[in-house]
Amino acid sequence: MLAKRIIPCLDVKDGQVVKGVQFRNHEIIGDIVPLAQRYAQEGADELVFYDITASSDGRVVDKSWVARVAEVIDIPFCVAGGIKSVEDASQILTFGADKISINSPALADPTLITRLADRYGVQCIVVGIDTWYDTESDSYQVYQFTGDEKRTKATTWQTEDWVKEVQLRGAGEIVLNMMNQDGVRNGYDLRQLQQMRAICHVPLIASGGAGTPDHFLEAFRDADVDGALAASVFHKQIINIGELKKYLSEQGVEIRVC
């Protein structure tokens, strides 16, 4: 069995790490490189960086900090933000990223997933899915341009259908960003994770809602996700990564303990 992964998420805006609640009202957390170093030292298995306004601004992630991060950490990291072509991806990987993640650009052009997977291999290609639970219809809907409150919009995709589609097109991993839970710290949406796990045959990463060590345990034990991504509990030092991994190991979760 592959070890489960703990993945701090760093949302980047204007060159700094920020964090919002339900993808809104972002506050500045700090500088990118020191935070990346801290998480690597605490025992994170990998890091994810989202340039949250790149797609809505029509630009590609700023590559200067990608190179600086690559110089100071020795764990894998993934970068997302406005990657719309093989050339965009090539530059980010050349600057030191281990994976690239696409979200809104994949919704605009689903063939991008296949082109990237064919060029770099599926192991390099992550698809992020921003999913919102609509109580009236009791359904999960995919959203686009979520880094910009003014441009955020629902797509025509139901989350389950998009999860199936991106796998067919070559996604090597899926990060499910559960918008209702984002930053609230009330736990991951286990029902949604279980539904998507049943149809997901590539690594599935839970994102949105972590507030306690038990929330991570539930995601691994009850939804069988491959990794758990979190931001605010790590940024605000509510949970220490090393202590979290020790707890999970004691509960029987297969995990790399520092």
Swiss-Prot record:
It holds the Pfam family His_biosynth. The active site is at residues 11, 130. This is Imidazole glycerol phosphate synthase subunit HisF. It is found in: Cytoplasm. One of its GO terms (molecular function) is imidazoleglycerol-phosphate synthase activity. Pathway: Amino-acid biosynthesis; L-histidine biosynthesis; L-histidine from 5-phospho-alpha-D-ribose 1-diphosphate: step 5/9. Belongs to the HisA/HisF family. It catalyses: 5-[(5-phospho-1-deoxy-D-ribulos-1-ylimino)methylamino]-1-(5-phospho-beta-D-ribosyl)imidazole-4-carboxamide + L-glutamine = D-erythro-1-(imidazol-4-yl)glycerol 3-phosphate + 5-amino-1-(5-phospho-beta-D-ribosyl)imidazole-4-carboxamide + L-glutamate + H(+). Heterodimer of HisH and HisF. GO terms for cellular component: cytoplasm. IGPS catalyzes the conversion of PRFAR and glutamine to IGP, AICAR and glutamate. The HisF subunit catalyzes the cyclization activity that produces IGP and AICAR from PRFAR using the ammonia provided by the HisH subunit. Its EC number is 4.3.2.10. It comes from the Bacteria. It comes from Yersinia pestis.
